[in-house]
Amino acid sequence: MPEAGGRRLHEVARINLSVEPVNRWRMKPRLRRASPLSHHLIEAIAQTLEARPDIDPARVGVVGAFFFGCLEYSVRFYKGLSTDGRRFASPILFPETVVNTPLSHVVAELGIGGPVYSQVGDTSCWVSALRTACLWIENGDVDHVIVAGAEEFEPHLLDAFHALRWFTADHPFRIAEGAGAVLIGKKTPNAIAEITRIADGYTFRTRDQARIAGLECLGEFDMNAPVMNTATSWAAQKAASLLSNRQLVSLSQGPQHDGFTASSAWNTILAARQRHYPRLIVPHWGLSQNIAAVEISRTAENTAGAG
């Protein structure tokens, strides 16, 4: 739907919280006043658990990746603070502005007993969340980890993106909200894919530095491996230059929307489920801090017969 940012209109893909299946959480006591982010997140994580009823929630950890956090309640809280004064800044709203609050709601409602951790950064923090999950499993802290990326939209984002010059004439920047989640565990025969390489922590402060960071990050991977097309906004031009000599793969259909860490989750799922490539590099082009990437390989059983 179109959303206004100042005098400008932009296409935004939003979630209707009043329809199934998302609305099943609206009347839960803990979630009645929770942020939209909490509702996006719990639905994604609940679907992940429901797909594997055989695992023990007490031995499941959760790592959340967020770029913006609980925007709607943050705006309402600070608007009350700035317009009506400190004594009108509602203490009911403040807890819902904390970035770890949505995960707290989720694990309490779903009975998840393992460690819980929130990673905050641009889109690339999804890769750091995957690394954290892999370390937990390697250390024996848990049997499985759900890694989730989630974002909620608030119209002030549009003004911020204009100020940052993220809306470009050459690359339309379509925004989305939502959540996605993946379940990570030890290697088993029924796994659809595996993470075979992680490269993260390639930081930048300017767009010219971003190109160098991207070059160094992608240099960690085999030059002959196909690369998923995931770049948006100004990063799309940098990515096109860097990947001109590599096989670029587009898996999403229709206009590409950027849900930031939610899109990172969706792209990871697409890469794991595709059947055309034995391995696929999935870059995560942060627009403000870092560039990171993951190599996802199909298991031998699931690659067999791929066309």
Predicted feature descriptions by range:
Residues 143, 149-154, 159-164:
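Glycine-rich anion/phosphate-binding loop at the beta-strand->alpha-helix junction
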Residues 51-65, 77-91, 112-115, 138-146, ...:
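Structural signature of cysteine-dependent C-C bond-forming condensing enzymes
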Residues 70-73, 125-129, 153-157, 204-205:
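Short, well-ordered, mixed-charge alpha-helical segments that flank or form enzyme active sites
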Residues 4-110, 114, 217-248:
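Conserved beta-ketoacyl condensing-enzyme motif
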Residues 65-67, 97, 110, 148-151, ...:
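Fold-independent oxyanion-binding glycine-rich loops
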Residues 1-20, 159-229, 277-279, 285-307:
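Condensing-enzyme catalytic core mediating Claisen C-C bond formation in acyl metabolism
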